[in-house]
Design a protein with these regions (language model features):
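Residue microenvironments linked to proteolytic maturation
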Residues: 47-158
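Acidic, proline-/serine-/threonine-rich low-complexity intrinsically disordered repeat tracts
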Residues: 161-164
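Flexible, gly/proline-biased loop segments at the beginnings
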Residues: 1-77, 102-105
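C-terminal assembly interfaces
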Residues: 170-171
Length: 171
């Protein structure tokens, strides 16, 4: 229930990335992370959905987001090399939680939280929540141009004028 109640807080949040030159890959949660994209503020553009994974026994939030090509050459190259797939981890503030379950279950029960961002992880970094990943769904130039035109039309009508210039769609 907490994931569904907090889902709307992902809207407008940044996608974060730090390049690790030693592994030629993304890093992890680091103070030097930079914003490389965003989740749209508009619910329709973000297309928030919930998918239950039978094998993992978990419900995942899925959302559309955009990554910028400009200034992110390393990330683009990494995504092309890795077939557009990377594990991710979310950054969040816990609002309401129960620490009494930590000893018995090995984790605290989170009842309410707010998303702060999504971090792209390197291949050598294990995601905190197994199955948390991203997949580039639009990487071709033609698909990018179509998505860009649709997105720009919506974005130009928004109050906060984010730019999707030189970006592509991920989910």
């Amino acid at each position: 229930d907490a994931i569904k109640e907090s889902a709307f807080t992902i809207l407008g949040k940044p996608i974060l990335f730090k390049y690790d030159m030693w592994t030629d890959d993304a890093s992890s949660h680091e103070p030097e992370e930079v914003q490389c994209g965003f989740v749209p503020k508009d619910e329709k553009d973000a297309d928030i959905q919930f998918e239950y994974d039978k094998d993992l026994g978990k419900t995942f939030l899925t959302v559309n987001a955009y990554l910028w090509n400009v200034y992110q050459e390393d990330l683009i190259r990494i995504l092309q090399r890795d077939d557009g797939y990377k594990n991710v981890s979310v950054e969040m503030w816990l609002i309401e939680y129960d620490e009494s379950t930590k000893e018995e279950k090995g984790y605290i029960t989170v009842n309410q939280f707010v998303y702060n961002g999504i971090t792209i992880l390197g291949s050598s970094v294990t995601e905190a929540c197994e199955g948390a990943d991203m997949q580039v769904v639009k990487f071709s130039y033609d698909d990018y141009q179509k998505a860009q035109l649709q997105f720009e039309a919506r974005l130009n009508n928004s109050i906060n004028q984010e730019s999707d210039e030189d970006s592509f769609l991920i989910q």
